[in-house]
Swiss-Prot record:
Its EC number is 3.1.1.-. The keyword Zinc does not apply. Keywords: Hydrolase, Signal. SUPFAM superfamilies: Calcium-dependent phosphotriesterase (SSF63829). Belongs to the SMP-30/CGR1 family. Lactonohydrolase; part of the gene cluster that mediates the biosynthesis of oryzines, natural products with an unusual maleidride backbone. The two subunits of the fungal fatty acid synthase oryfasA and oryfasB probably form octenoic acid. This fatty acid is most likely activated by the acyl-CoA ligase oryP to give octenyl-CoA before the citrate synthase-like protein oryE catalyzes condensation with oxaloacetate to form tricarboxylic acid. One of its GO terms (molecular function) is hydrolase activity. Pathway: Secondary metabolite biosynthesis. This is Lactonohydrolase oryH. It comes from the Eukaryota. The keyword 4Fe-4S does not apply. Gene3D superfamilies: TolB, C-terminal domain (2.120.10.30). Residues 1-20 form the signal peptide. The gene is oryH.
């Protein structure tokens, strides 16, 4: 009798497992109210696939595998993933983001090199971004006046070399520049944070060293404000080993926070009752910059996050746990700082290897490709409670922004992922180019502009960026 019961129990356990590979419901479905497959709903996050599925992991950074390349032999619906512009992971919240009439279009075709540091300037209704090319000193400027956007080149005075992050605040653009070169015209150039008056094109150095060491890279700035608060801004600048980018402003009492990574990244937190500015910067990009030719110097300091006080000039370390900090942004209430770790991009950092022999960036999908969240202390002086919230489904989470409602947005491979505060995917925008960074622009901050390798795109969704000062 006992043996019979054991056998029955075993049979009951095996039965569900035997049927687990047979999905009766298609993984990819039409979404109510939208055209299919342009908008595709993923059934239960496609977390249970028929057993005969396979995704090949690429090690070629020029041809990284994508989610849509997954082979799902026993579910023909999955072929629609590659045809979709929008992938909806959470039907209720994803549909709320899409709104009634979502739009996506390629506005400009540009060179296939890396493009970074998009920033919207409300004073002039312009969108600036950079080209991370060897010896490239011009910035790209898109005018949003008129019926159709136009694009032109601008040379600041002095020039900026390889900015990988930017934020706007109080009439100025704050760039995190990652280029390092002593012989390039107009130089020498060193990674750091530079401010630019978008009307006069004049640039000014804000910070460019850590006790005499070059920052590896400065990257991706972002700005935030808190209306009516007496606290100052916290500006975060992140710079991964691949490229420098990451800068954000937050209302916080009197400090700047900087991050510095072996690859790229300097985070600066600036906060003052009178100055009202906080910068966070990560420094790691020199490593990456050296691999793509925009820096001639090997990394000198470890990947870290620092606090910088603009009143005294003091720089203090606040985090050194990320391997390659890159994208950075604050939550709307400034209580959470989000950082990306793009360690899957593997650079050559050995200073003994001559610049002429430094190989291009390598890729390893088993390294970190993660978005992290940190709590910010009440006085804004340190970070705590680090936790991973998302591993990118494609490539690495590069640029990072936070919408006015708190949703986290990251450029990752051939697309942009929109997450809730826990890192759960809600919606993905699929692009036919590598999406590096993005920014909310337009007079109502309701256009998401995406820059990367080969294109500038614009998405119009029911989502807005945080207010600018």
């Amino acid at each position: 009798m006992y043996l019979s019961l054991r056998l029955v129990s075993l049979a009951l356990c095996i039965a569900p497992l035997a049927s687990a590979g047979n999905n009766s419901t298609p993984l990819v479905q039409a979404c109510t109210g939208y055209s299919f497959p342009r908008v595709a709903c993923m059934y239960r996050y496609a977390s249970k696939m028929p057993l005969d599925f396979y995704r090949k992991a690429s090690v070629d950074i020029s041809n990284v595998d994508t989610y849509s390349s997954t082979e799902v032999a026993n579910d023909d619906s999955f072929q629609q993933v590659g045809k979709a512009t929008f992938l909806v992971w959470d039907q209720q919240r994803g549909s709320e983001i899409l709104g009634s009439d979502p739009a996506y279009d390629i506005v400009f075709t540009i060179s296939t090199g890396g493009h970074e540091a998009p920033v919207y300037v409300p004073d002039t209704n312009e969108l600036w971004f950079s080209e991370l090319g060897k010896g490239e000193l011009h910035q790209q400027v898109i005018s949003l006046d008129g019926d159709s956007p136009t694009i032109s080149e601008v040379l600041t005075d002095p020039p900026l070399y390889a900015p990988s992050g930017a934020r706007y605040r109080n009439g100025k653009i704050y760039f995190s520049a990652g280029g390092g070169n002593s012989t390039l015209e107009g130089g020498p150039y060193h990674p750091g944070i530079y401010s630019v008056d978008p009307k006069t094109r004049k640039s000014t150095i804000e910070v460019n060293n850590y006790f005499g060491w070059y920052f590896n890279q400065v990257s991706m700035p972002t700005a935030h404000t808190r209306g009516g608060s007496p606290l100052s801004h916290f500006c975060t600048l992140v710079d991964p080993r691949l490229v420098a980018h990451g800068l954000t402003f937050q209302h916080r009492p009197t400090t700047w926070i900087l991050t510095n990574t072996v690859a790229s990244g300097l985070v600066i937190l600036v906060s003052s009752w009178t100055r009202d500015l906080t910068l966070v910067h990560t420094d790691a990009a020199i490593v990456l910059a050296r691999n793509h030719g925009t820096s001639t110097v090997a990394p000198q300091v470890q990947a870290s996050v620092y606090r910088y006080d603009p009143e005294t000039g003091a720089v203090n370390i606040v985090d050194d746990t990320l391997h390659c900090p890159n994208g950075v942004a604050f939550s709307p209430d400034y209580k959470t700082l989000y950082l990306t770790d793009t360690d899957a991009g593997v650079p050559m950092i050995d200073p003994r290897v001559p610049l002429s022999e430094v190989p291009s960036l390598q890729y390893n999908s088993t390294n970190r490709r993660t978005v992290y969240a940190f709590d910010v202390s009440e006085d804004g002086s340190y970070l705590k409670n680090r936790r991973p919230i998302y591993t990118a489904k494609d490539f690495v989470p590069d640029g990072l922004k936070v919408a006015s409602n708190g949703y986290v947005i990251t450029g990752a491979g051939k697309g942009v992922d929109i997450l809730d505060t826990t890192g759960t995917p809600l919606l993905s925008i699929q692009t036919n180019f590598t999406a590096v960074n993005m920014v909310f622009g337009g007079k109502n901050l309701d256009e998401l502009w995406i820059v990367g390798h080969g294109a500038v795109a614009r998405a119009r969704l029911n989502l807005t960026g945080p207010a600018l000062e």
